[in-house]
């Protein structure tokens, strides 16, 4: 056992308070992969512990063990000093563990309140569901998050940010002592993040132990007390976060210095490839015009609700525009479905890859070749060798980390899942690729690799639209940036005009 992790640091607020939860010598082995290797950590009351690591480092596996999805091959878990077995998800909940996951696990056709209290709804004396109490408690939880979401509406009517708030409310509805937050701020605005952190501090004051997973260092340094760094399934470092420089954390994560997170390649920009004129949607955006040139990375920036993703989905044929004109390589085209877009050479990497970009139970190779079956079949019959060869080509190009291309894509880390989504669209040999939050939930080492790959694609002549909420990313990677606000395009900035202040002023209407 790594001795450094047998006595983790304690929060000054809790002094020598014993750990609520300990993991000792935990190993998790899958065919061909040791996902966790002799990991020992402890979570103390009133302390936020940041779990940091690249995708594939073992963070997701640890969370699945703590939530009863996996049972470790080696090691033990102790709650209040007593050995405990999380044989099921319910057993973990009963032990006081709850999780807010990176990808929200909610049900579109249920109401907000039903999602919040699914599995633990309040009951009447007759053991029927107490709908009035459930709706009232849901409203109280949402109000605590400073949200005015109606608990009686169906989840499908909510935005991505609102879905995350419902997921947080669901976790808070269970009286847990150990709260795991896995990328909880990924789709939240700055105000919503501030609200969440206020709640996290309240949980600390109540003596909860919080495990906080994020790739956003500014958020980690703002909210976390301690940290544990994972690399290749091992716990390689720990300490007080605010006393440890970010560069040192990064070196622990990747085993090297990451000098250039935004490796932008200077490209000779060509002529117009995609021209959008006065594109309008019934409710989400109106009169949006843009020109995307060959080899260009056109960034689109804006706050939540600006209409960026909705514009991207319309260009990909997910929704139909109310009016407007679309020209590709000088020829006017009509996009009424994703099939039309793919056929024309326009592809879209969605923000929520798990819900919209992948068939999680299917193997990696099938996910990567789904849009390209015409290339891997003859006379209506799939050629397995060609299918594998095509998948392998893009898996190698993207440095995909997986035991085999035959494993379900749902078993991969978030970063590797994103590589599968990008790879499947590159296999169609597109002219335009739209990337919606391409590094959402991706660690800093993988981020640099993805940015480098995006730059390489642009250098090869691919035209790229990149939607991002991260100012360093949008500024570091874009040749030009279109700013949207409340469905309108409110500014177009050349590369030499880009600054955080200018983009935020435009996005908030204070230009």
UniProtKB/Swiss-Prot annotation:
Membrane topology recorded in Swiss-Prot or TrEMBL: Peripheral membrane protein
EC number: 7.5.2.7
Catalytic activity annotation: D-ribose(out) + ATP + H2O = D-ribose(in) + ADP + phosphate + H(+)
Signal sequence, start to end: none
Keyword list, A-Z: ATP-binding, Cell inner membrane, Cell membrane, Membrane, Nucleotide-binding, Plasmid, Repeat, Sugar transport, Translocase, Transport
Top-rank taxon: Bacteria
Entry GO MF terms: ABC-type D-ribose transporter activity; ATP binding; ATP hydrolysis activity
Record localization: Cell inner membrane
Gene Ontology CC: one annotated term: plasma membrane
Entry-linked InterPro entries: AAA+_ATPase (IPR003593), ABC_carbohydrate_import_ATPase (IPR050107), ABC_transporter-like_ATP-bd (IPR003439), ABC_transporter-like_CS (IPR017871), P-loop_NTPase (IPR027417)
Subunit structure: The complex is composed of an ATP-binding protein (RbsA), two transmembrane proteins (RbsC) and a solute-binding protein (RbsB).
Stated family: Belongs to the ABC transporter superfamily. Ribose importer (TC 3.A.1.2.1) family.
Function recorded in the entry: Part of the ABC transporter complex RbsABC involved in ribose import. Responsible for energy coupling to the transport system.
Name this polypeptide is given: Ribose import ATP-binding protein RbsA 3
Native source organism of the sequence: Rhizobium etli (strain ATCC 51251 / DSM 11541 / JCM 21823 / NBRC 15573 / CFN 42)
């Amino acid at each position: 056992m790594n001795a450094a992790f047998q006595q983790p640091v304690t929060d000054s607020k809790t002094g020598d308070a014993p750990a609520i939860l300990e993991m000792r010598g935990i190993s998790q082995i899958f065919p061909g992969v040791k996902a966790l290797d002799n990991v020992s950590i402890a979570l103390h009351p009133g302390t936020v512990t940041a779990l940091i690591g690249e995708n594939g480092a073992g963070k997701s596996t640890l969370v699945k063990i703590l939530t009863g999805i996996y049972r470790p091959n080696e090691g033990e878990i102790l709650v209040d000093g007593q050995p405990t077995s999380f044989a099921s998800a319910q057993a973990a909940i009963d032990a006081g563990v709850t999780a807010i996951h990176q990808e929200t696990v909610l049900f579109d056709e249920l109401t907000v309140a039903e999602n919040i209290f699914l599995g633990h709804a309040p009951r009447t004396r007759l053991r029927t569901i107490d709908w009035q109490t459930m709706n009232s408690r849901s409203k109280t939880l949402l109000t605590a998050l400073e949200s005015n979401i109606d608990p009686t509406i169906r989840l499908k009517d909510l935005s991505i940010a609102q879905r995350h708030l419902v997921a947080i409310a669901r976790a808070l509805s269970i009286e847990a002592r150990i709260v795991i937050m896995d990328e909880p701020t990924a789709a939240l605005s700055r105000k919503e993040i501030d609200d969440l952190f206020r709640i996290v501090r309240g949980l600390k004051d109540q003596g909860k132990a919080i495990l906080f997973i994020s790739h956003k260092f500014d958020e980690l340094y703002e909210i976390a007390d301690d940290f544990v760094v994972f690399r290749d399934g091992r716990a390689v470092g720990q300490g007080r976060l605010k006393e440890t420089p970010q560069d040192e954390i990064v070196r622990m994560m990747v085993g090297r210095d990451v000098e250039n997170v935004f490796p932008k390649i200077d490209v000779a920009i060509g002529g117009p490839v995609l021209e959008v004129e006065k594109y309008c949607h019934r409710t989400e955006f109106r009169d949006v015009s843009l020109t995307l040139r060959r080899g260009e990375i056109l960034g689109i920036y804006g706050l939540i609700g600006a209409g960026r993703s909705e514009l991207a989905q319309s260009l990909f044929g997910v929704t139909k525009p109310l009016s407007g004109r679309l020209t590709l390589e000088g020829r006017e085209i009509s996009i009424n479905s994703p099939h039309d877009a793919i056929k024309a050479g326009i592809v879209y990497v969605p923000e929520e890859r798990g819900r919209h970009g992948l068939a999680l139970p299917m193997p990696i190779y099938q996910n990567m070749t789904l849009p390209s079956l015409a290339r891997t079949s003859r006379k209506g019959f799939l050629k397995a060798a060609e299918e594998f060869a095509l998948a392998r080509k893009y898996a190698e190009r993207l440095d995909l980390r997986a035991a085999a291309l035959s494993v379900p894509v749902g078993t991969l880390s978030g970063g590797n899942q994103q590589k599968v989504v990008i790879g499947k669209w590159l296999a169609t040999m597109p002219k335009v690729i739209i990337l919606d939050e391409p590094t959402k939930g991706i660690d800093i080492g993988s981020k640099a690799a993805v940015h480098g790959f995006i730059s390489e694609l642009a250098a090869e002549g691919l035209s790229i639209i990149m939607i991002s909420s991260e100012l360093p990313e949008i500024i570091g990677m874009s040749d030009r940036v279109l700013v949207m606000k409340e469905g309108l395009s409110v500014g177009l900035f050349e590369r030499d005009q880009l600054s955080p202040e200018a983009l935020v002023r435009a996005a908030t209407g204070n230009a």
